[in-house]
UniProtKB/Swiss-Prot annotation:
The keyword Cytoplasm applies. It comes from Campylobacter lari (strain RM2100 / D67 / ATCC BAA-1060). Its cofactor is Mg(2+). It comes from the Bacteria. It is found in: Cytoplasm. SMART domains: KH, S1. Residues 559-619 form the KH domain. Its EC number is 2.7.7.8. GO terms for cellular component: cytosol. It is an enzyme of class 2 (transferase). This is Polyribonucleotide nucleotidyltransferase. GO terms for molecular function: 3'-5'-RNA exonuclease activity; magnesium ion binding; polyribonucleotide nucleotidyltransferase activity; RNA binding.
Amino acid sequence: MRHKININNHIEIFDTDKVAKQAAGAVLMQEKNAVVLATVAREEKMVEEDFLPLTVQYIEKAYAAGKIPGGYVKRETKPGDSETLSARIIDRSLRPLFPKGYAYPTQIVVMVLSADPEVDLQVMSLNAASVALYLSDIPIKAPVCGVRIGRINNEFVLNPSNSELKNSTLDLYVAGVKDELLMIEMRALSNKKDNQHCMNELSEDDTLKALDFASSAILRGSNEYEKAFAAYRKNSKLEFKIESDNIQIIDYIKNTYITKLKIAINQMAKSERASEILQIAKEIESESMAIENEWKFEDIEKALHVCKRELVRNQIINENKRADGRGLKDVRKIDIETNILPSAHGSCLFTRGQTQALVVATLGNDNDAQMSDMLTEKNPICEKFMVNYNFPGFSVGEASPIKAPGRRELGHGNLAKRALYPSVDADYIHTIRLVSEILESNGSSSMATVCGGALALRAAGVKSEKLVAGVAMGLVFEEEKYAILTDIMGLEDHDGDMDFKVAGSHDGITALQMDIKLGGIEQKVLQEALYQAKEARGYILNLMQEACEKIIVNEAILPKVEIFNVDPNKIPDIIGQGGKTIKDIIEKFEVNIDLDRDKGEVKIAGIDHNLISQSKEYILNLLHSKGSNKRRDKKEMPKFDIGEEFLGRVQKVVEFGVFVELKEGVDGLLHNSKIKEKLEVGHEIKVKVAEIKNGKVSLDLA
């Protein structure tokens, strides 16, 4: 059945019960020329483990844009970074909808079958997946709606096209259901004004206005989807895990082990991997009370976690005190060291409590930029600013193998990139790669990456517009009471109701990410959280500024760049036949050379400034000598008059005519169309000058 919905500046067409009918839920969605297929499939048997076994995959098919995959393997292989990040957005938006006790392995797959350069595939894919999930037999309360908000000429724009987004100073992606916001991703988009770089940070008040604008659109969209598809939902006959209330065990813990549990919580505040809970569970299991009542070990563990959560939250709500002794607004102790790696271009060891990030900046040339194929772009996208985030197991005390970056690492690196990128001028001459090695982790490692990254840039001599800092905020909500936490640690992230990361300068927000576990959040609470984050950000920025003033940039190891312009027509002279000339220059002077054929721009990069200057002088002398030779050749060429006759000798026979020698070393072309008899090399023939153009002589028969 086909459903046509006109909502939020989009005309969306949904085909249900047409394709993938074996899946639990499926929908084919079209917007303009873009078509996506979203499917939901689940297993019949529940898993034993206590977690939601949900997998989300987002796949862009090359044929959707009329392309054949590049490389040796001409088919889609593992997903690219952009596909992984899109899958994360869908996952974070839909995961909160699943009912408590749902434990069926579930897979949501979104495939882009046809692309349109103007259609936002992220928004479209989330909405298609939401409808497919709503149509399935998984009992979610209502469909999610995702929207993107831009800001053009200081006006908020709902669901801007891809070309409109290029003129926007804001990129805000929000997902929610009805009047509840579930997921937020925001970034400031820098640009040029009067040839000046502008970061375009968003103020806290403007951020709230943008979220309010998005909330209205989400409510409309969620209601429209519910209205259109409620009658076509599958009946749910699923059973859910019945959680044991473990009241007897909980009471026993509170009466007997509360002191030990408080000590354990204090230890857990210092490490994400503290094993104190496990030790207490083993101790209880061995007691006669547990043996007589046949308490299962997993039930004891669950009861301990219930008590632990209750203790942590009550202490925060009722005493305004946290597990590590901090107040609600306190930031953990910060230590900063810069340029601790002698051979690296720039480095910063940023430590906040038990979270530590070593962030290293490397400067390169244009050839070092990351080239990425984008489905809706004809040419690869060139990224000159990269952030890589690594999270080894030892950072939380685990002996796990180091593997390729996973979804979490890609997501954290992308968040740090969005936070820092506006501070760097897009015209900056170097390619920049930041690598964050998380050496310790107890919450907020992505925000430590932002802080360390901003300082590593300065340590590498990058003149960023402003320093950028980040802080992770948390929320604990109990009935009518709530508490907002600054600089949350792992324990508070796990037992809290909101994960809210805010990064920016003194003047506003450059990036924001929020995942809400409890459903809707009131505007006043969000406002309070934003301003509390601003206060913490200001405190951290002041410490970072003090560290900046002590930075000693190692100029000797930094790459230098010389840029100059030449006649674009002379660029081939620099390249030489088969690239021989430019290769010789690069090898001789130990430099890298980038050429812009359209602008005639020559960019020389290297470590030694003298060698760069010498290579520049060499190139200019080369072009000067080439020009002199051409002028001399032009000067020495005999002068001919139109109609002047010669008795010439055929020097060369080619496919399109013959070359006839007029004077020593000077030939003219007699085209086939003007030849009346077969001519061979050595034949004499009488010709006359017909035309002279660009130093070339065309002949006629005399």
